[in-house]
């Protein structure tokens, strides 16, 4: 089920994917204008040109701000797949919008607006509506801040081998998908497209940050860890009250013009998080998920796919990502 907070009425709605998008997008549920998009899913570069093209998002310079556009591309294992998932970019943007607003009392974030009326005219088309976010400019910190509340995925594989997750020793006897006694912080480096992120210790994160920001490494590392845990606890409690388990997630932070740590990038989307249904949850095995874990599992089972998904897998991915929508 969806749980969507309409800030105009503060009411909670339970929606299907097709019902949710028009409400979230304020009437921008039209089909994306394919004339504005190249075949590989990258938006046409005419008046505005992306200054950065990530695995899923494209970032445009807007003078004193940035426009971050979420495409319908999907990535897995640090590779961009050949397929697109219809409306995925809209879902990611609207989920981030909700969570940025929900957690603004914990720390500031980079979101300024998701209304294309607040953006240059170039972005006021169906191709960009619902999937674009106007953001503050930040100096991004070179750490991906991962927090795990449940043991699963690569963490479970590591625990089975040596009783640790990213170098953190955990109690004996844990089961797959079991909730951890306390959430654990497992940072990683940020890899370029095609490369793999590297898990690092908290101590190593201090070194990485100190190298780029002399005299501030430990201070920034501590803030990243503490903010990451605080954000996870607040959001996991809310999601649980709506029937969703947030097993783990990733945050990214940057610095504003005054050197303050600010939350950036995306927040608690199916691309950055594992969402499980609370109903039917039981530790001891893998869980059904409302995220792209379904795609990862299919790719593992089909190593010769050349990262090309069949239509039925794409359709199921659309349904699963839609059910996670906030």
Spans of model-derived segments:
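Conserved metal-phosphate-binding beta-hairpin within the catalytic cores
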Residues: 147, 246-267
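A long amphipathic alpha-helix within ATP-dependent nucleotide-binding catalytic cores
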Residues: 211-247
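Anionic ligand-binding catalytic core segments
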Residues: 161-162, 170-219, 267-323
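Active-site loop/lid in soluble adenylation, ligation, and acyl-transfer enzymes
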Residues: 29-192, 305-323
